[in-house]
From Swiss-Prot:
Protein name as catalogued: Light-independent protochlorophyllide reductase subunit B
Quaternary structure, from the entry: Protochlorophyllide reductase is composed of three subunits; ChlL, ChlN and ChlB. Forms a heterotetramer of two ChlB and two ChlN subunits.
Organism of provenance: Prochlorococcus marinus (strain NATL2A)
Reactions catalysed, as given in the entry: chlorophyllide a + oxidized 2[4Fe-4S]-[ferredoxin] + 2 ADP + 2 phosphate = protochlorophyllide a + reduced 2[4Fe-4S]-[ferredoxin] + 2 ATP + 2 H2O
Taxonomic lineage: Bacteria, Bacillati, Cyanobacteriota, Cyanophyceae, Synechococcales
NCBIfam families recorded: DPOR_BchB, PRK02910.1-4
Gene3D superfamilies: 1.20.89.20, Nitrogenase molybdenum iron protein domain (3.40.50.1980), Proto-chlorophyllide reductase 57 kD subunit B (1.10.8.550)
Length: 525
């Protein structure tokens, strides 16, 4: 067992809950103790939904364990069916209830309901949230379509209609899924392609039954939909796309792949460079400032891989770290990291990720909510590219990540922290100039002239300093700290560590301005 303050993924029943809450006319009975009802907050607080998840908890307590908990489960299942009247019922158990082995799915199937019942067996102690979501979606599709005929159907050309596709994978608590769906629907409409079903987000069991009416499945989020797409291809002969349209290059490749699978002629407009402002900026003089910037990437497999491609091929960044917390995606991330001359970081320990960030000294971190906190402590700009996320990453406005507009949003989210970082560095460099001195006359007239107290001087220095100082650690003098503060904040941590290592080797007890430049010469030699 591992005790941690933060975790990238919850247990698999949270993934099942995401699928159930994303869909309509479906209910989830979860055999769980009273403490596991916290999951409701994920949707009401972070997603800011106006309704509770369609989940009924058995909420057994310690005193119930001495009796027949199976009867408790059956009672809650009957109440849920009578009250909510779902078209499909999901039945599962949380990590705690798994130990009791009541097998609620089998109990539900023996109660004689005339609706499809999906029994979820999610190994809570070996799998996590994304796997649970993927398995739940797979079981729903397989249960509802198991009797569907596998006979070959007519193509869209034979039926003389526009081609149809399914968009599979978007869920609640996914990263910008709502807006991605709208953007991809708009994008496909421009090329004469209709969307048949979007699932699981917004889909009902009746919509799942319409999945075979499509010509192609678009796998938008492999963590959730890949296993389902493979089953649909194998059993219903529906091919699926493998390119995720994140970034300009990937969007072009996605459109080419989709046109090829649909046997459509690829239009020239797919390759036009004016579809996104990201391409224009990358070709502009202004982008020279960002060329070669060191970037560290960590997130779910889909977004981490896409971020690495965008950073390396479209923005000219240097990727110094690449990793994922999703072990199911590790097989795809490792070769991508190797192609960049890196070793992939596969871990679910946020402290290990923070140590990797310190070691690589990037100028920009692209990660999750946890990397945002780590980067803030280290004084490094950060943009969130993946779940887990907090409420500020679920904007009320339209803010996709996929397609042409998604590339624009990514461009803004990644470039702005670096540009603001340059401004911060310039202010830090010239803060001793007379125009920045506290008490100088302000352009605001009567509101100016009052000195402002700097309440966060440590932020100017750096917060990469070890919290525990031993007798062997050299001490920074005031002159040394002052000179260190003139170094750009995004490399200041690395300079501090190198200087301290040099001072230890040279036997210096104090680090002054001269020691700092001696260390610089030593490491350049």
């Amino acid at each position: 067992m591992e005790l941690t303050l933060w975790t990238y993924e919850g247990p698999p029943h949270i993934g099942a809950m995401r699928i159930a809450t994303s869909m309509k006319k479906l209910h989830y009975v979860l055999h769980a103790p009273q403490g596991d009802t916290y999951a409701d907050l994920l949707f009401t607080m972070i997603e800011r939904r106006g309704s509770r998840p369609p989940v009924t908890y058995t909420t057994f307590q310690a005193r119930d364990l001495g009796g027949d908990t199976a009867e408790l489960v059956k009672g809650h299942i009957k109440e849920a069916v009578d009250r909510f009247k779902p078209e499909t019922l999901l039945v599962g158990e949380s990590c705690t209830a798994e130990l009791i082995q009541d097998q609620p799915g089998s109990l539900a199937k023996g109660m004689g309901f005339d609706i499809p019942i999906v029994s979820l067996e999610l190994p809570a102690y070996s799998k996590k949230e994304n796997w649970g979501g993927s398995e739940t979606f797979y079981q729903i599709v397989r249960t509802l379509l198991k009797d569907h005929s596998n006979e070959s159907k007519h193509t869209w050309q034979e039926e003389k209609r526009r081609p149809r596709v399914n968009l599979l994978g978007p869920t609640l608590l996914g990263f910008r899924c709502r807006d991605d769906v709208l953007e991809i629907q708009k994008l496909l409409g421009q090329y004469g392609i209709d969307v048949n079903v979007v699932a699981p987000l917004g889909a009902s069991p009746a919509d799942i039954l319409r999945i075979p009416n499509a010509d192609v499945n678009v796998c938008l989020y492999p963590e959730i939909a890949e296993s389902t797409c493979i089953w649909l291809e194998r059993n219903l002969n529906i091919p699926f796309t493998t390119t995720v349209p994140l970034g300009v290059g990937a969007t072009q490749d996605f459109l080419k792949e989709l046109h090829k699978v649909l046997e459509m002629e690829i239009p020239q407009s797919v390759n036009e460079s004016n579809n996104s402002k990201l391409t224009w900026y990358s070709n502009s003089v202004d982008s020279n400032y960002l060329t070669g910037k060191r970037v560290f990437i960590f997130g779910d497999g889909t977004h981490a891989l896409a971020a690495a491609r965008i950073a390396n091929e479209e923005l000219g960044f240097k990727v110094v770290g690449l990793g994922t917390y999703s072990r199911e995606m590790a097989r795809k991330v490792r070769p991508a990291a190797k192609a960049l001359g890196l070793e992939a970081l596969i871990t679910n320990d946020y402290l290990e990720v923070e140590d990797a960030i310190k070691e690589t000294s990037p100028e920009l971190v692209l990660g999750t909510q946890m990397e945002r906190h780590s980067a803030k402590r280290l004084g490094i700009p950060c943009a969130v590219i993946s779940t887990p996320m907090h409420v500020q990453d679920v904007p009320a406005r339209y803010s996709p990540q996929m397609g042409w507009e998604g590339a624009n949003v990514i461009f803004d989210d990644w470039v702005h922290p670096l540009m603001m970082g340059l401004e911060e560095h310039l202010i830090g460099m010239f803060k001793h100039d007379f125009e920045f001195v506290d008490g100088h006359q302000s352009h605001l007239g009567h509101l100016g002239g009052k000195g402002t107290q700097n309440t966060n001087k440590e932020a100017i220095k750096t917060n990469l300093q070890d919290s525990v100082i031993t007798d062997s650690d050299p001490i920074w003098t005031h002159e040394g700290e002052k000179e260190l503060s003139k170094i750009p904040f995004f490399v200041r941590g690395k300079v501090r560590r190198n200087t301290e290592n040099y001072a230890r080797q040279a036997g210096c007890r104090e680090i002054n301005e001269e020691t700092l430049y001696d260390a610089k010469a030593h490491y350049k030699a």
